[in-house]
Amino acid sequence: LTISVMYFNEHLPISHEIEFWLGCVVALLMGALMGLAKMTLMSTLVIDTSESIMRTEANYISSWFGRVSLAIGAAIGLICSQFLDFRSTILVACAMGLCSIYFVRRAKFPFRAPEDYVSLYSTDRFFLLQGIPLFLLLAMVTMSAGLVVSTVINFEFFCFMFAGFVLSIISEKVVFSDADLKSEPITGLICMLLSLGMLLISQLPIVDKIIPVLFAFGVGIFATRFMLFLIKLSRHCQRGTSQSTYFLAWEFGLASGIALAYGVLNGVKTDIYLVALGLTVFVLLAYNFLLHPWYMSHRNR
């Protein structure tokens, strides 16, 4: 319903200023409602419909759908913008929302008795307070991703990003299955640094195909390991809270990166890539020398 407002927005008899603020309100509502739906699915329903021994695997799979959608959603959006007008693109988005409602209604969720007392405000299943250091570094990495994505208007780039995500899924099961905990985040950050460096200095056509694969590979394995770190940092009955914290870091970072690219850096690609590079270098140093030792001494699982 919120997205459908944009369908009529450009035909309303209102001034450009009111139209701008209406767009801001729609974006705010869309983010809040999408966040509510996704947090409920990831932190409650996915967990409640899984056996206790399979809940980490269920969280792992559901989080990957969120990462892969970064490439698939952007690619579909670019296709729609090339072959359809703006209003038709909005209709496609509404149709996808209806499909989501259909699939959620098809799932069978177990009945749970309500609690005797429900507080008005609570951080339960919202934010894992002991996971703030992980939240901050993950948000910085996804901010780098948001910065890079903001410069892309190429369908091919997102196709190669999807390939990079697939490679990271395979590598987690084959290469990193018995590797040291530190290896995945470090490898992911190094891959991100290499791709950002190539964005800044290389003009070769073949590099344009390597960069999105390498960048998505790095973001994928880093985010996956941090999602598992948050689970292991949580205490009893805080698994859902850890997933909400992960989701909040992922979406906050992406949105902040895109806002920074257009609102502060004015879309200048060189400046955007330099900021993304600086953020990634900072995360690499902070994780290697500060966060990993802290995590090893504070994890609960």
PLM features per residue range, with description:
Residues H16-A37, I206-A223:
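Hydrophobic core of transmembrane alpha-helices in multi-pass small-molecule transporters
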Residues V26-W64:
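Cytoplasmic helix-loop-helix junction between adjacent transmembrane helices
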Residues L36-S50, G220-R235:
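Intracellular juxtamembrane helix-capping segments at the cytosolic ends
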Residues M54-L78, F247-A259:
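Glycine-rich segments within core transmembrane alpha-helices of 12-TM secondary carriers
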Residues R87-R106, D271-W294:
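Symmetry-related core transmembrane helices of the 12-TM Major Facilitator Superfamily/SLC fold
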Residues S234-K269:
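A late C-terminal transmembrane helix in Major Facilitator Superfamily
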